[in-house]
Every structure is written in C-alpha cells, then in structure tokens.
C-alpha cells in the first residue's frame, strides 16, 4: 500500500461519517439504531488505528442524536463509545477489552492491510458501510443513499393484501379501501372521503380554486390529472378504441365508461334508493338529491344550486352571456342544448317520433305534449269539462279555486 502523501492531509471522522436529521432518526427502530452505531464505531476504530482521531479523549463521550460537531457526537443511541464486551481478534484469537483496543491490536499484524492513503481509506469505508447496511441478515433494511442514511425499506404491511408502505399514515389511508371507512368530511356539502388529499381536491369545487393551468389555452383545472387529460385535446390523439363500435377516445377512463353502453353495466349504486349509475360522478350528483345540499350560491340573486355547472348556466341570466353561436345564421344561445335544438331548424332533423301516429318533433318535450292526444282526455273534477292537455286543465281549475 502506498505511503500517505502529506499534501493530502489526514482523513478525519467527518470524511467518512454518515449523519441523521432529527426526523430521520425518529424513523429508525432500536435494531436499526444499533446497526448504525456498530458501523460508526468500526469507522472510528479504523481511523483511531491510523492515528487520525483521538480515541482516548472521546472514548467515554456519549453518542447523542443531534447535529454532529465531532467524533463524540455521532448520531446514534446514548450508550458510550467504549463497550464493555470483549472483542476477539480474528487473526490470533486474542481477547481485547473493547473495539478501539482491538483496532490498535490489529495494527500489530503486518499482514493486515491498513489504508494510509486517504482516498483509498475513504473508498474502503464507503464499501464497508454499503455492505453493512445493505446485508439482509436480521431483516435489516437497506437505508444508505447519497452518503446519508434513509429508510428505504417499506416496513408497514397491510394485513389484508400484503402491500407494503414506507409510512404508517399511508398504510392507514390504504386500509380504508378494505374497511370502506370514509373519515374525511366536506364541511360544505357533507360528502365523505377516504383520504384527506381527495377531500382537498373536492373542496376546490366549492372555493373555485383551479391551480393547474394549460399553457396552450389557459384553461385551469382542479387537479393535475385533469390537466394531463385535457392536454390531449390539443394533440388530437385518440388512442383508445371501442371494440364494439369502433369509436375512438382520448382517455381510457372515457372508453371504459362508454363500453357500459354496450354491456349495460351500472356498477355505482346509491345506498339511499338503490339506483345504479354508469360512472361515479353521476352517482355523486344524484346523491345530492338525498342530502338536499345546495352548496353553490348565486352572488346576484342568492339562489342556490346543487352543482357548479348549473350555477354557471344560471349566472348567464344575469350577465346576458350567450357563448354558443349557430354557424348557419349567427344566432347566439346561452345553453348548448338550446343551440342543438335550434340547429334542427336548419337541418330539418326531427329525432323524436310518436309511436302511435309516426309524427316527428324537434324536441322531446314537444313529443310528450303531443302524446296526450292519444291518451284519455283530462276531466275537471269540479265541472266535468274535458281537456286535451293537462296544462290546459290546470289553468281551467283556477276558475274554480279563484
């Protein structure tokens, strides 16, 4: 082994030590702390045998968790550096009082290859630390990364499915999938959620916060996944094809929902009335019928609505906004559904046909009104007069009620 170059200087404990923050230390169990202590003691012993640190001065100093300022404050449990257990020499079987004296004794064996070059010693120390901390004996996990000690092992196991988690709170959130527990309640509408992060995203529907903005069109979204899905609109990509009808979709979730049109599957059931829905969002909207919650209030007239989209449409009454334009005649409409109905004037389309007489209509409401012609006439209970339409009967009855 080459002699040490004086220009390179001594290797000190700080060069090869690994330190914890207070938070990291708190994540280690007793076995992991003892393992860390053993490795640091070996590092110190090797340096002591080279005369690179003063073991006698620090020998009895306790190893405290905290910010390291030297050899005596390695981040480890409180036992003293000097251990009372005898240490056997692997070369000659001699018993030494402690690990420091064993290191000094090892130097008496010329065949022992001591590192006098700081670079060689530093590399040896890193390899030794990796080997110690990554070995599988005793179930000790690997927790060295970037010359610091971290818990990379996932030590919290779900007893139901065996999935492992690195933090206890993540395991707790996961276990709610098995129990169905929903502990996070929205203070505005009362809906319950399994995870706090899901509740936080939901609450943005009440506050109006939309932190994720598309850099193409400026449209903002409640959560990042919605932004990612939206951005495929600009690329035009539709990679998901329905095997039944060949229709293409931008997102796999939309394809899955669409395929329920063919299968008739409605997996989302209301616990209140037993009604089933094709997608979860429809169930959430329906559930508000039972809760009676109307969380979205109009700042102009004070009227409340169950959904933000309904509030947005209502507010056009006050603003006069008509964002939907007919490309045939240039007429504007406040609702897209009204524009679609209007466009049938230009196309001649009449999609709603009477099953009795075959007459077709522009809108479903017109068809329903027409179908009363084929049903029994409506009779006034007061005077016995008959009417074709229920609406006409109701107007007539006001004559009797005043």
From Swiss-Prot:
Gene Ontology molecular function: any one: zinc ion binding
Zinc finger (C2H2-type): 87-109, 156-178, 184-206, 212-234, 240-262, 268-290, 296-318, 324-346, 352-374, 378-400
Every KRAB domain range: 11-82
Keywords for the protein's UniProt record, in alphabetical order: DNA-binding, Metal-binding, Nucleus, Repeat, Transcription, Transcription regulation, Zinc, Zinc-finger
Subcellular location(s) per record: Nucleus
Location, primary (coarse class): nucleus
SMART domains referenced in this protein's UniProt entry, alphabetically: KRAB, ZnF_C2H2
CDD domains documented for this protein: KRAB_A-box
This protein's GO CC annotations: nucleus
One GO process term, biological-process aspect: regulation of transcription by RNA polymerase II
Transport in keyword set: no
Chain's role: May be involved in transcriptional regulation.
Family: Belongs to the krueppel C2H2-type zinc-finger protein family.
Protein name per UniProt: Zinc finger protein 547
Originating species: Homo sapiens
Gene behind the chain: ZNF547
């Amino acid at each position: 082994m080459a002699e040490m170059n004086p220009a390179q200087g001594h290797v000190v404990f700080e060069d090869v030590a690994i330190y914890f923050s207070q938070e990291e230390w708190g994540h280690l169990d007793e076995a992991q702390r003892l393992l860390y202590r053993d490795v640091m003691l070996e590092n110190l012993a090797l340096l002591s045998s080279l005369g690179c640190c003063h073991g006698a001065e620090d020998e009895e100093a306790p190893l405290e968790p905290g910010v390291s300022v030297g050899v005596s404050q390695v981040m480890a449990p409180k036992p003293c550096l000097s251990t009372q257990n005898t240490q056997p020499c692997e070369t000659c079987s001699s018993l030494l009082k402690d690990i420091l004296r064993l290191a000094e004794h090892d130097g008496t064996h010329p065949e022992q290859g001591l590192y006098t070059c700081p670079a060689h010693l530093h590399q040896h120390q890193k390899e030794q630390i990796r080997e110690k901390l990554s070995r599988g004996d005793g179930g000790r996990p690997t927790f060295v990364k970037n010359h610091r000690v971290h818990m990379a092992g996932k030590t919290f196991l779900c007893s139901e499915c065996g999935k492992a988690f690195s933090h206890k709170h993540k395991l707790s959130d996961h276990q709610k999938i098995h129990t169905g527990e929903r502990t996070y309640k929205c203070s505005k509408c009362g809906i319950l959620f399994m995870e706090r992060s899901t509740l936080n995203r939901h609450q943005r529907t009440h506050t109006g916060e939309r932190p994720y903005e598309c850099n193409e069109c400026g449209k903002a979204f409640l959560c990042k996944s919605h932004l990612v899905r939206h951005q495929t609109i600009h690329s035009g990509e539709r990679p998901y094809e329905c095997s039944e009808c060949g229709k293409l979709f931008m997102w796999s979730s939309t394809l899955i929902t669409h395929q329920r049109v063919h299968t008739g599957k409605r997996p989302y059931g209301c616990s209140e009335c037993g009604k089933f829905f094709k997608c979860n969002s429809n169930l959430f909207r329906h559930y508000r019928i039972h809760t009676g919650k109307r969380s979205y209030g109009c700042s102009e007239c004070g009227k409340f609505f169950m959904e933000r989209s309904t509030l947005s449409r209502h507010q056009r009454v006050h603003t006069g906004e008509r964002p939907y334009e007919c490309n045939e005649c240039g007429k504007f409409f406040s609702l897209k559904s009204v524009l679609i109905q209007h466009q049938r004037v230009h196309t001649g389309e009449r999609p709603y046909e009477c099953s009795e007489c075959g007459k077709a209509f522009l809108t479903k409401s017109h068809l329903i009104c027409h179908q009363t012609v084929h049903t029994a006439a409506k009779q006034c209970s007061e005077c016995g007069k008959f009417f074709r339409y229920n609406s006409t009967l109701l107007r007539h009855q006001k004559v009797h009620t005043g």
